Amino acid sequence: MSKRTFQPNNRRRAKVHGFRLRMRTRAGRAILAARRRKGRVELSA
């Protein structure tokens, strides 16, 4: 039997998909802007 592929880890989640990471690059800021435009309640992990 193989293990489940999703092994939750809050620290890794934030480091890979977090707000500060998104703000770091121009493309990341564009993602946040698009999500704000769309009216998302949560912008990032």
Curated annotation (Swiss-Prot):
Record keywords: Ribonucleoprotein, Ribosomal protein
InterPro entries named among the record's database cross-references: Ribosomal_bL34, Ribosomal_bL34_CS
Database matches in Pfam families: Ribosomal_L34
One example GO MF annotation: structural constituent of ribosome
A GO biological-process term: translation
Keyword DNA-binding on entry: no
Entry keyword annotation includes Protein transport: no
GO cellular component: ribonucleoprotein complex; ribosome
The family this protein is said to belong to: Belongs to the bacterial ribosomal protein bL34 family.
NCBIfam families reported for this sequence: rpmH_bact
Protein name: Large ribosomal subunit protein bL34
Gene name of this polypeptide: rpmH
